[in-house]
Amino acid sequence: MQMYFYNLVKDTDPEIAEAIKNELKRQQNKIELIASENFVSIAVMAAMGSPLTNKYAEGYPNKRYYGGCEYIDVVESIAIERAKKLFGAEHANVQPHSGAQANMAVYFAVLNPGDTILGMNLSHGGHLTHGSPVNFSGKLYNIVSYGVDPETETIDYDEVLRLAKEHRPKLILAGASAYPRIIDFKKFREIADEVGAYLMVDMAHIAGLVAAGLHPSPVEYADFVTTTTHKTLRGPRGGLILCKEKYAKLIDKSIFPGIQGGPLEHVIAAKAVALKEAMTEEFRNYQIQILKNAKALSERLIERGFRLVSGGTDNHLMLVDLRNKGITGKDAEKRLDSLNITCNKNAIPFDTQSPMVTSGIRLGTPAVTTRGFKEEDMIEVADIIHDALTNSDTDDNILQRVKALCEKYPLYSEFRE
């Protein structure tokens, strides 16, 4: 298969074509450890590049403001039904352009400006849209944040309950972007019921694990569940909302006409393809391997003297506290990237460094697992990280070790110029 997207673009716009080609090579030749990234299938990629991108389709299946939507309705209806089936949900909205907009839609559906949200502190593993003061959520709503216990570095449910009783939030938000442990959604439901709050769960990072039955599902406990469709779900970049049927009209109106106009039907088609892939035994085995790889990577890092926040991981990601290595997260990210390993700097709980410097890095296994990495490869990755950050091997040797792993598990080998 030719690198069709490059060849089709290069005659019209060689600059963009060159950037596309170089990005493909970057993905192929680097070890991707950013926990929120993954590699979609060729089928998902093809759906995103389909003629569906040409069609305006404001509204919902069989209730459009434009004519000519009969095939768009087929696509979106399939995506909706697959999302409901995969996660056991009563209602699904597949139109959010992103996870952030999915979260915004839930807020706009049931909250008024100034209402109180109880969500996880960004510096303890939460997300910008969970109430950060620089985000719309922090600007529009009264935010109360819970965090992790200083000793265990896991969610302090007693603190969550205490804060809920004290502040009486209208909505309690569970979910995180950098939390390596299983979240007790049943406990959050009990707390929400005690204070009469809505419960919303942002499962963006763990959606693939939930779909495969390898992480407790929030769907039975939460009034609203939001997620991205990339990350562990391995679909296109986009968002998804699941909710109880009684909230269906509120959510749908909040997305359109509330915060979005025309949906991206080519992306919705790609979501549908990814959701079908997620129903297979192959996908479940992939998620099992994600967990095995995360366990192997975390255990080897600990053996090599790294401290992991909370002592390890239950899911696909881990937070590495670098303070005992004498290097900041920012410098570690830069150092590893120079050696063809991609990760991101990340604050650790109670971090004294600024968010642009940080004391840690976040590592995840979804992307390398898609390539085919197994436990023994993750041990080598951990050793490479150790050697890179402690200068225990030459840069040339490390680059060769990274190259060997990338060549062992080629990515998008179907594409050629």
Curated annotation (Swiss-Prot):
Pathway: One-carbon metabolism; tetrahydrofolate interconversion; Amino-acid biosynthesis; glycine biosynthesis; glycine from L-serine: step 1/1. It comes from Caldicellulosiruptor saccharolyticus (strain ATCC 43494 / DSM 8903 / Tp8T 6331). GO terms for molecular function: glycine hydroxymethyltransferase activity; pyridoxal phosphate binding. HAMAP family: SHMT. Belongs to the SHMT family. This is Serine hydroxymethyltransferase. GO terms for cellular component: cytosol. (6S)-5,6,7,8-tetrahydrofolate binds at residues 122, 126-128. Keywords: Amino-acid biosynthesis, Cytoplasm, One-carbon metabolism, Pyridoxal phosphate, Transferase. Its EC number is 2.1.2.1. The keyword RNA-binding does not apply. It is found in: Cytoplasm. It comes from the Bacteria. Homodimer.
